[in-house]
């Protein structure tokens, strides 16, 4: 009989968001009249920017002509999009990133998992706790961990606790590690890292020959001009980092799918025989074999993000969601709750009241206020006693959700 990948059997009961969906579905079946407001999963709600829609319509029309038709595109992405990304997202900030170091994909979630394809077994992996679950689960699936313990932590991973005590920014590990997952602005806590903090990580990685996997999916929400948007704003990062970016949250591409990963040329790892190997070549080979590229139509839409009109519309979208975050912060603070995040990220991180556990607070809000959020314990053991609310919803729904919670 065919054998299964036993690593999947080590995964905890369910990925966080499907478990939320299961509970919400059961509640809705029992309470069909309830008008739920969803502030849980980080899915956007506002329409795509007009500039992107128009660009995609033009691309669709072109596909209907012999001269404008596009079949398989470059697995790495079309040159015109890669050049726009390199110039406007990186070179404009002083980062030495070239277009051929940009790999366009259908999602940073996919890329942050698939990057393990080019990294060998035996690497010591460090993740924050709490953490975006994909970083942990993808390592479990790839056989890079042992079993989960009583608290849900997996053997073989180095957990770096983050809390209010360290401003939700992990301390440099005391033990040597090889792979370091960093996410700033942080999901789920909404914390950001200063230039000095990122420099400390780059210095550590360079001195220990480690690799930083830097998730910058929420960089567009940073409000302080002193806070770096990219790890490559830090000197030396080209020698030790890969960065993941997405159009999902800033431009509303969650349903159209477009993202990119930055792999600098000259970034190297070690083969089993001790030989130094360039990671750019491995990732290029991996993408050429396992990925057929993002749709021409979608890439034209992504390119429009960098137009003058597109930039203005994206800025308006980001401002809208950040105003939602501000409303959530203000209203919950007025209730005496301890609130974090929501200033440079679309997530508000809440200390649950009265010693309530995370899932208990989830059920409380679901049943009493018909509001759906995300239990902090779903992001790791150190997230127990916290709760995440997302600013991704309409202004009407955010205001209504706050009114319901305040009435409890």
Curated annotation (Swiss-Prot):
Coiled coil: none annotated. Its EC number is 2.6.1.83. GO terms for molecular function: L,L-diaminopimelate aminotransferase activity; pyridoxal phosphate binding. Keywords: Aminotransferase, Pyridoxal phosphate, Transferase. The modification N6-(pyridoxal phosphate)lysine is found at residue 249. Substrate binds at residues 15, 42, 109, 132, 187, 292, 388. Pathway: Amino-acid biosynthesis; L-lysine biosynthesis via DAP pathway; LL-2,6-diaminopimelate from (S)-tetrahydrodipicolinate (aminotransferase route): step 1/1. Pyridoxal 5'-phosphate binds at residues 72, 108-109, 132, 187, 218, 246-248, 257, 292. InterPro entries: Aminotransferase_I/II_large, DapL/ALD1, PyrdxlP-dep_Trfase, PyrdxlP-dep_Trfase_major, PyrdxlP-dep_Trfase_small. It comes from the Bacteria. It is an enzyme of class 2 (transferase). GO terms for biological process: lysine biosynthetic process via diaminopimelate, diaminopimelate-aminotransferase pathway. Its cofactor is pyridoxal 5'-phosphate. It catalyses: (2S,6S)-2,6-diaminopimelate + 2-oxoglutarate = (S)-2,3,4,5-tetrahydrodipicolinate + L-glutamate + H2O + H(+). Belongs to the class-I pyridoxal-phosphate-dependent aminotransferase family. LL-diaminopimelate aminotransferase subfamily. HAMAP family: DapL_aminotrans_1. Involved in the synthesis of meso-diaminopimelate (m-DAP or DL-DAP), required for both lysine and peptidoglycan biosynthesis. Catalyzes the direct conversion of tetrahydrodipicolinate to LL-diaminopimelate. Homodimer. This is LL-diaminopimelate aminotransferase.
């Amino acid at each position: 009989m065919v054998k299964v990948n036993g690593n999947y059997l080590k995964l905890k009961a369910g990925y966080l968001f499907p478990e939320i969906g299961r509970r919400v579905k059961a509640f809705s079946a029992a309470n069909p009249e309830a008008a739920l407001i969803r502030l849980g999963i980080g899915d956007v709600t506002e329409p795509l920017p007009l500039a992107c829609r128009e660009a995609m319509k033009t691309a669709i029309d072109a596909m209907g002509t012999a001269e404008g038709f596009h079949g398989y595109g470059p697995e790495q992405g079309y040159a015109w999009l890669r050049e726009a990304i390199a110039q406007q997202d990186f070179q404009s900030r002083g980062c030495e990133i070239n277009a051929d170091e940009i790999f366009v994909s259908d999602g940073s979630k996919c890329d942050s998992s698939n990057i393990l394809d080019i990294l060998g077994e035996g690497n010591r992996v460090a993740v924050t706790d709490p953490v975006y679950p994909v970083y942990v689960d993808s390592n479990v699936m790839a056989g890079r961990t042992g079993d989960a313990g009583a608290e849900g932590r997996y053997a073989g991973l180095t957990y770096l606790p983050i809390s209010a005590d360290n401003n939700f920014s992990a301390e440099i590990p005391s033990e040597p590690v090889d792979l370091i997952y960093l996410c700033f602005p942080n999901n789920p806590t909404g914390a950001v890292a200063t230039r000095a903090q990122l420099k400390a990580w780059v210095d550590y990685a360079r001195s220990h020959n480690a690799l930083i996997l830097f998730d910058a999916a929420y960089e567009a929400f940073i409000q302080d001009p002193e806070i770096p948007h990219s790890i490559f704003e830090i000197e030396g990062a080209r020698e030790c980092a890969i960065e993941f970016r997405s159009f999902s949250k800033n431009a509303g591409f969650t349903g159209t799918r477009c993202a990119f990963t930055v792999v600098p040329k000259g970034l190297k790892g070690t083969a089993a025989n001790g030989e130094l190997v360039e990671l750019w070549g491995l990732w290029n080979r991996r993408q050429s074999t396992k990925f057929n590229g993002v749709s021409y139509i979608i890439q034209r839409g992504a390119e429009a993000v960098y137009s003058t009109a597109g930039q203005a519309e994206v800025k308006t979208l980001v401002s809208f969601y950040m105003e939602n975050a501000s409303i959530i912060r203000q209203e919950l603070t007025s209730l005496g709750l301890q609130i974090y995040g929501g200033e440079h990220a679309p997530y508000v991180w809440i200390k649950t009241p009265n010693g309530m556990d995370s899932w208990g607070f989830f059920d409380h809000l679901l049943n009493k206020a018909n509001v759906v959020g995300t239990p902090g314990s779903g992001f790791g053991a150190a997230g127990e006693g916290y709760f995440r609310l997302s600013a991704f919803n309409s202004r009407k729904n955010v205001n209504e959700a706050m009114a319901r919670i305040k009435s409890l």
